[in-house]
């Protein structure tokens, strides 16, 4: 077992090395060409495309955590050039997957029977690919349409290998303190949890119950009899992924409605369920023209100790301006109990300006936030940069931060305008949710 | 006229005899496999096999001299089964080369799965030079040749399609060696559902086809 793991790790190391080498190779080629021919914008675009396509192909072969990293990068809208982003965003749904024969064999490895012996119909071509597996359409013996998610074989050991590599690659960052060790551990834990589909089935049940009050939201039902830790059979959900949905040019009203609902879903999860669907990449959302939303892929769920109501109170009332004790309390809420006060203060000016946009103080002011607003983006990246520089990332907030970042990315792509203050007010006041919350907590 | 009918009857009779003989052979093999799966290769005696198959022990020896002959017959039958499956499977016809080769080994492993202990025992026995199971015995060589031709035809098709460069007979030999490696790995694979073997098989086949396609022999 151990020996095999080592071999896999060396193989991956080799491939990652090759990726680096081949990129350097073509960068050098580009520089040489540049030197000889002079720079043309056209060629630059083409080059970027080639390089990022190579990144995508190599990441697709590697699978596992490295691919997740690619997905995370692709959500950082402003960090990468537009062309690279477009190629990378392909990773989110269209990762190179298993051929039909492998998927069928892996199904049998998990359930002990071939799919054709379990279902009335089984589509051997997958309709969606995820980093850890792929999804096939099927019809049960009783005639229900289902989606069957099949995991790539031995993905768990592949992820463990990637993290061994990632640990050595991030050593300088960890030594300097810019990347807390806990953060890498937390990511690894999160990714490994995603490989357990039984856990995901439990999450699906939890959120189906807990969010049942949001009538516009559909969450698939699990068929436990056709599921194991590596195969997950769920009811089929209608809808289109973000890119396809936007091609239909939905009206601003629909986009705003969807944006508002996404924000409501997020606040409700944090405040009432104390658990968050933390994998906000656009492939996990299915949209319908009437504004209904389907939420799939509950592999990455974060139990949160984040006191969002206390934090929102700070944001809305600007409590930190009132006394030093209040300021300390505010920092503890955002950056955890061991926050270095002096360094946290340096972030405050940017945070205040962000707060003025998202939660305007003046009651009469127009509180609608346009997620395409360049000012918001500028402040957002300034804020992330400050946090990184002042080493303020609390490990337990890694996945929540990732979830929030993903949500903002979707709102940006959607071009939605959302009244964040009003959304929060309504979620907070929704007394009816109280019962559902206790129900959901009981069942968990 | 009369003679002709008589001749026909004789041929028919012979055909029936051959058929019956095959039937008994298969019944013996079925009984033996069941016992191998339960008790293991070494602890199963020819006596118990004949009792299970419902024939006299002496009759058993008319068909199979030793347990090794039984094992040889098993391998011949499973090779015939794979070739037949491959030729009638619609998906295999249009699949890309890595999937075809994956399908062949996966189909083989799936049919071997209930008899893992038996396969392991045969592996050990085949190391003895005097054994009929040794890869150098004429019986083994004949079967191996049939297998090589089968793989050679599949590779030739991929060569025609330009999926891989021309490999000659070497491709089939290399694949046969690879298959032995995979079966050895599979025998020792303790992961659930033997998924490590699936992953190994998939990656090896994809990578080697990829490299062959990219550079042929020149890389």
Whereabouts are the PLM-identified features?
Chain B
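Helix-turn-helix
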Residues: 27, 31, 35-73, 77
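Hydrophobic alpha-helical connector segments
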Residues: 73, 88-121, 141-142
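Amphipathic alpha-helical segments in well-ordered regions
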Residues: 31, 77, 108, 154, ...
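Secondary-structure edge/capping motif, primarily at the C-terminal ends of alpha-helices
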Residues: 86-93, 122-130, 158, 186-190
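Amphipathic alpha-helical packing segments from all-alpha helical-bundle domains
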Residues: 132-160, 169-180, 209
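Amphipathic alpha-helical segments used for helix-helix packing
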Residues: 112-138, 149-155, 184
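Hydrophobic/aromatic residues within well-ordered alpha-helical segments
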Residues: 74, 78, 82, 104, ...
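C-terminal peripheral helix-coil segments that are non-catalytic and often amphipathic
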Residues: 1-12, 149, 153-157, 184, ...
């Amino acid at each position: 077992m151990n020996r095999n793991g080592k071999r896999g790790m060396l193989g991956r190391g080799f491939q990652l090395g090759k990726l680096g080498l081949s990129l350097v190779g073509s960068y050098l080629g580009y520089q040489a060409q540049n030197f000889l021919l002079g720079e043309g914008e056209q060629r630059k675009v083409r080059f970027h495309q080639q390089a990022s396509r190579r990144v995508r192909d190599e990441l697709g072969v590697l699978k596992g955590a490295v691919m997740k990293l690619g997905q995370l990068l692709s959500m950082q809208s402003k960090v990468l050039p537009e062309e690279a982003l477009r190629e990378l965003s392909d990773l989110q749904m269209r990762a190179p997957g298993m051929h039909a024969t492998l998927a069928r064999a892996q199904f049998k490895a998990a359930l002990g029977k071939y799919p054709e012996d379990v279902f009335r119909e089984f589509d051997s071509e997958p309709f969606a690919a995820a980093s850890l597996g792929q999804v096939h359409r099927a019809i049960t013996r009783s005639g229900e349409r289902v989606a069957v998610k099949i995991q790539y074989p031995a993905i768990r050991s592949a992820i463990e290998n990637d993290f061994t590599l990632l640990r050595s690659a991030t050593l300088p960052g960890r030594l300097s303190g810019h990347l807390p060790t806990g953060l890498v551990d937390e990511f690894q834990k999160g990714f490994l949890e995603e490989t357990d589909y039984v856990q995901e089935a439990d999450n699906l049940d939890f959120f189906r119950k807990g969010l049942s009050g949001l009538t516009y939201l559909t969450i698939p039902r699990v068929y436990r009899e056709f599921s194991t830790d590596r195969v997950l059979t769920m009811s089929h959900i209608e809808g289109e992924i973000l890119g396809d949905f936007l091609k239909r040019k939905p009206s601003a009203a629909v986009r705003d409605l969807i944006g508002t609902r996404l924000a409501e879903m997020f606040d409700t999860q944090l405040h009432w369920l104390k658990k968050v669907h933390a994998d906000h990449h656009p492939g996990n959302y299915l949209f319908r023209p009437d504004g209904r939303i389907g939420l799939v892929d509950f592999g990455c769920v974060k139990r949160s100790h984040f006191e969002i109501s206390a934090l929102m109170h700070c944001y809305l009332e600007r409590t930190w301006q009132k006394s030093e004790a209040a300021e300390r309390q505010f920092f503890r809420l955002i950056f955890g109990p061991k926050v270095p006060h002096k360094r946290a203060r340096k972030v405050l000016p940017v945070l205040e300006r962000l707060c003025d946009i998202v939660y305007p103080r003046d009651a009469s002011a127009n509180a609608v936030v346009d997620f395409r607003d360049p000012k918001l983006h500028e402040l957002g990246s300034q804020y992330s940069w400050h946090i990184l520089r002042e080493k303020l990332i609390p490990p337990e907030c890694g996945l929540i931060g990732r979830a929030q970042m993903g949500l903002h990315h979707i709102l940006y792509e959607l071009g939605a305008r959302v009244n964040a203050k009003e959304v929060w007010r309504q979620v907070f006041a929704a007394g009816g949710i109280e019962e559902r919350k206790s129900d959901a907590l009981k069942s968990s | 006229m009369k003679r002709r009918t008589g001749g026909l009857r004789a041929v028919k009779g012979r055909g029936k005899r051959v058929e019956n003989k095959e039937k008994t052979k298969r019944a013996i093999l079925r009984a033996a496999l069941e016992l191998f799966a339960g008790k293991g290769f070494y602890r199963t005696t020819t006596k118990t096999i004949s009792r299970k198959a419902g024939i006299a022990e002496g009759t058993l020896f008319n068909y199979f001299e030793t347990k090794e002959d039984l094992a040889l017959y098993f391998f011949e039958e499973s090779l015939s089964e794979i070739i037949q499956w491959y030729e009638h499977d619609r998906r295999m016809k249009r699949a890309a080369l890595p999937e075809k080769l994956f399908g062949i080994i996966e189909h083989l492993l799936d049919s071997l799965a209930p008899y893992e202990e038996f396969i392991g025992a045969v592996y050990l026995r085949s190391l003895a030079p005097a054994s009929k199971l040794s890869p150098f015995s004429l019986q083994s060589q004949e079967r191996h040749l049939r297998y090589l031709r089968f793989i050679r035809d599949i590779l030739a098709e991929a060569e025609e399609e330009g999926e891989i460069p021309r490999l000659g007979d070497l491709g089939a030999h290399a694949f046969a060696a690879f298959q032995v490696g995979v079966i050895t790995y599979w025998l020792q694979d303790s992961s659930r559902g033997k998924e490590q073997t699936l992953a190994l098989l998939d990656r090896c086949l994809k990578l080697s086809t990829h490299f062959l396609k990219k550079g042929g022999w020149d890389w």
